[in-house]
Amino acid sequence: LGTYRMALLMTRTGLVVLTLAIICGAFGVHGLGSMVTENRLETWETAVRYQAWMSLSMIGLGVSSFKVSSWAFWFVCSGLLIFSGSLYALVLLDLGILGVVAPIGGALMIAGLLLSAISLKPCD
């Protein structure tokens, strides 16, 4: 593969893997919680965490020569603020109702990452 194609492959792969990390994290919380032991759930969370960090390294290796849709950036940023912000507030303020807000942020993060993967273009 040429330099351009390799950078594109690394970046797109990283974005898809990061998207899957978010999906796996949500599955761990909502799907596995009552089906596995606490120890196994912690192991699952460790796997998700490492997957996310490694996907970021792939993205970092590839992004230096690409432009991405600004919409993707704003989706990811707003999703992160809504998702993490609602969970932090849920924990700190003990407001259970905020748990229903988190999936909106998760959906925005997933949409932003997929839009990033689709909209990548080489810099001029």
Region roles according to the model:
Residues 2-124:
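Polytopic transmembrane helical bundles with strong interfacial aromatic enrichment
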